[in-house]
């Protein structure tokens, strides 16, 4: 959290940002990334306090100006939208987008429905859960791709997420449902993943086109690749699709903006020229080695420049959000 000068001495339930003192297992490189962002915001000149307790802000006696949330992987259903909802309740500016927009982005099936209503090209898909069960017959032609309906970091995606038959879908989907997850089954898209990072502004700013590297079948991005990121990213040319992608981004911004920053993840088959949107990510990775910083560097901007811009734009976006309304207890 970025806060006013002198707030560090009394903020309730502060946690040491050094994860070596309080280790978090099973999260790959994310704890280190979170710590690096904490330090980067400090280095800009903000007074920053780290806390894993959202209610710390309420005990800060009005001395917190902004919540820069990295908290989207914790033990509750739909954790990604909690912080934005909570900050709206206590009326303090926060990173990302309003909670209703976060909810659209975090529910990959809902994203698909909204994008289809905007006449954007998305693959066919169906949501599955333990309550609904798995249809006996395939609702659309294969091959198929099976993943979690909710969640970040390509959670649950493995090489066998590509399914050539509905029988294989049944097996893969049951594995995820037995782990307690809702499932999204999509029509598998040939090609490669291309992510398009976008900054908020008076008009959305497309930073570039980035391919997450993959050594998996179909060049898919699996959970282990996302968590450990040993292959990294590379800039790619989208050939003659730039104007079409810009049109996609404008449609999304017109319907869902303003947002502080986001990514649109495509699957592009350069042989056929077909592009399909898989999902949208808000409050996504801002690490120096990630897609957003890589794209920004092509324009001469550093991670520090990005953080300064995003925080400043976010504060401006929420300039009418009253802090600590008098009706709050």
Q: Where are the predicted features?
A:
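Conserved metal-phosphate-binding beta-hairpin within the catalytic cores
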Residues: 87, 187, 197-198, 253-288, ...
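Active-site "cap" helix and flanking loop/linker of ATP-utilizing ligase/carboxylase catalytic domains
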Residues: 211-262, 294-329
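Short beta-strand segments
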Residues: 11-13, 147, 186
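Hydrophobic beta-strand scaffold residues
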Residues: 48, 93-94, 122, 144, ...
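Phosphate-binding site of ATP-dependent enzymes
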Residues: 164-247, 270, 274-276
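Anion (oxyanion) recognition and catalysis
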Residues: 42, 88, 116, 177, ...
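Active-site nucleotide/adenylate-binding loops and adjacent lid/helix of ATP-dependent enzymes
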Residues: 1-6, 102-184, 191, 243-246
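ATP-binding N-terminal substructure of ATP-dependent carboxylate-amine bond-forming enzymes
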Residues: 1-94, 100, 129-136, 318-321
């Amino acid at each position: 959290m970025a806060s006013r000068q002198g707030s560090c001495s009394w903020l309730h339930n502060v946690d040491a940002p050094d994860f070596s003192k309080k280790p978090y297992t099973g999260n790959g490189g994310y704890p280190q990334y979170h710590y690096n962002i904490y330090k980067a915001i400090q280095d800009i000149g903000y007074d920053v306090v780290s806390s894993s307790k959202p209610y710390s802000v309420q005990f800060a006696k009005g001395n917190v100006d902004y919540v820069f949330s990295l908290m989207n992987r914790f033990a509750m259903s739909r954790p990604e939208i909690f912080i934005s909802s909570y900050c709206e309740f206590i009326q303090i500016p926060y990173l990302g987008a309003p909670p209703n927009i976060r909810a659209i982005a975090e529910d990959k099936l809902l994203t698909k429905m909204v994008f289809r209503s905007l006449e954007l090209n998305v693959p066919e898909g169906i949501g599955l859960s333990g309550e609904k069960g798995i249809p006996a017959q395939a609702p659309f032609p294969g091959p198929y791709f099976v993943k979690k309906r909710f969640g970040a970091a390509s959670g649950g995606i493995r090489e066998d997420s590509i399914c050539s038959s509905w029988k294989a879908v049944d097996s893969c989907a049951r594995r995820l449902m037995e782990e307690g997850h809702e499932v999204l089954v999509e029509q598998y898209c040939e090609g490669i993943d291309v992510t398009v990072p976008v900054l908020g502004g008076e008009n959305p700013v497309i930073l570039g086109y980035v391919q997450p590297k993959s050594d998996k079948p179909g060049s898919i991005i699996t959970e282990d690749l996302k968590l450990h990121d040993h292959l990294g990213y590379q800039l790619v040319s989208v050939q003659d699709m730039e104007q079409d992608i810009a049109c996609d981004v404008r449609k999304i911004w017109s319907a869902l903006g303003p947002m502080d920053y986001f990514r649109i993840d495509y699957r592009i088959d350069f042989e056929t020229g077909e592009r399909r949107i898989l999902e949208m990510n808000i409050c996504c990775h801002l690490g120096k080695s990630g897609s957003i910083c890589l794209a920004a560097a092509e324009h001469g901007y550093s991670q520090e420049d990005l953080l300064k811009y995003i925080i400043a734009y976010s504060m401006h976006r929420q300039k009418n959000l009253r802090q600590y309304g008098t009706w709050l207890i």
